């Protein structure tokens, strides 16, 4: 399960050998696709819902996973920042709110959610390898033949172009390394709004070892253990993450803001710009290196 904007995406995948490599000449790819589709359209449930015992186990495991995030302080700090920054948006749904909803799931409500997904979810099938496109389409239609008429749609994500004020949250925890996370509205109206310019800007600012945050905050001034920036495209938010000693907090903030002003004033070098473009292009080219990478792009 992954999050894209204010929507969740469920990904199911299966890997098998090519049919030409089987001993008996049977179609492994076709059988694998049928198995994958059956997991989606024919789960272990009846008219009364999913198995209470299996559901109870999944609720417990999911709750444990949510509650354990605090053990990963970097991830926890990121989550708390987004919860605070997007407090009035679906994107800012808190860990406790999610946990409360998870514990309320029943066999019947889960069955209803599954049916809703089949009726309204956008289904995308990526098949990589020596497999017939027509065969894939045929098996997909057969798998959904009992679903009836579908009305697929994806709810729109709210993009906030500019923050009205500054919100700050500090939590005291026992740990060796403090975490500083900053969130900025990227001025985007949707996920495609001048995306590539913003992608390069974020990369020059804090995307790699050539970036201004890495070269100055970490290397030149030695104010942190790490300092990086990334763009959450699906929500239009630029996030800066840094591991610091708490006594250096203000110094780190001042230097990050100084580097941001340099970016805003266009005072970065042509070398920085070209290094960023090369790194991003190389990353996009690498998507073709493996079947898995191709299937998820």
Annotate each language-model stretch with its function.
Residues 64-68, 167-175, 282-289:
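Short, low-order "capping/linker" segments at domain edges
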Residues 48-59, 76-82, 97-98, 152-166:
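Short, surface-exposed recognition loops or helix-turn segments adjacent to catalytic cores
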